[in-house]
């Protein structure tokens, strides 16, 4: 269905109160005044742009067909019409580096979107990227390296008070069947947040010169599993460092926050 046809179907749900609003996504170079007026007319409240990168060279190499300036222009126009702005970025694109992704995140933060999605690049069969991978011209991220990078990005967006509504591809939808290489994991965000917590725990231990032995790590209740890590990997890592860690819920700690005390101090 074309725009107005889709609008006729969805707008009635906004009008009768079934939906609070409609979210859609599109390319940055698809936004103009006419499109904004149509979206507004049919009850769209949030628009996400597939920015993917703010490096013009990376965009060119991946044949995205738009520029970083297109992202800036479209973002400003959408906000001027009162839409909630969402931006999507990808890590590990062909020709991209971790530094490119960090710079992309900084540029996205400067545009002040309400939401962000982060997608590590995944190589699927029967694509140009698959041919580049098979020829050795493209080396995709590993799950671990992508999780380390995305952990940094999550912290950046959190500090900027921007909500990350998705990290990593959804499981299902045919991804597993076509998957060839790259950073795909069905619980990717959990991996990233596990990285955040173990990195913060190690940093806290070093900064406070906590001696080896039994420790208690205080985190928010909903962060206990993240601090523990998948298959208890964070607990095991601390064990290797000489720390027997117990994790407890603490209402005084916020998102991505923790503090550690020696068990003997209780």
PLM features: residue spans?
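Generic "edge-of-domain/loop-turn" microfeature
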Residues: 31, 56, 94, 123, ...
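Conserved non-cysteine loop/helix-boundary elements of the Radical SAM core domain that shape
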Residues: 1-118, 125-144
């Amino acid at each position: 269905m074309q725009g107005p046809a889709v609008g006729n179907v969805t707008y009635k749900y906004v009008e009768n109160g079934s939906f609070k609003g409609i979210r859609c996504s599109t390319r940055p170079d698809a936004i103009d005044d006419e499109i904004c007026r149509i979206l507004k007319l049919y009850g769209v409240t949030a628009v996400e742009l597939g920015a993917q990168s703010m490096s013009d060279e990376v965009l060119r190499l991946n044949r995205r067909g738009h520029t970083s300036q297109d992202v800036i222009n479209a973002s400003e126009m959408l906000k001027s019409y009162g839409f909630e702005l969402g931006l999507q970025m990808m890590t590990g694109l062909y020709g991209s580096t971790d530094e490119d992704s960090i710079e992309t995140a900084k540029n996205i933060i400067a545009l002040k979107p309400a939401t962000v999605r982060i997608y590590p690049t995944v190589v699927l069969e029967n694509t140009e990227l698959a041919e580049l991978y098979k020829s050795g011209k493209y080396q995709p991220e590993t799950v671990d390296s992508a999780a380390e990078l995305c952990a940094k990005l999550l912290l950046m967006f959190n500090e900027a008070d921007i909500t990350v509504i998705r990290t990593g591809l959804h499981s299902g939808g045919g991804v597993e069947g076509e998957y060839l290489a790259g950073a795909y994991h069905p619980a990717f965000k959990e991996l990233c947040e596990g990285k955040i917590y173990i990195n913060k725990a190690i940093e806290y231990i070093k900064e406070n010169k906590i001696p080896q032995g039994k420790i208690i790590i205080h985190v928010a209740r909903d962060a206990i599993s993240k601090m523990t890590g998948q298959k208890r990997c964070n607990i095991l890592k601390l064990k290797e460092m000489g720390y027997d860690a117990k994790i407890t819920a603490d209402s005084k700690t916020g998102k991505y926050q923790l503090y550690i005390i020696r068990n003997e101090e209780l």
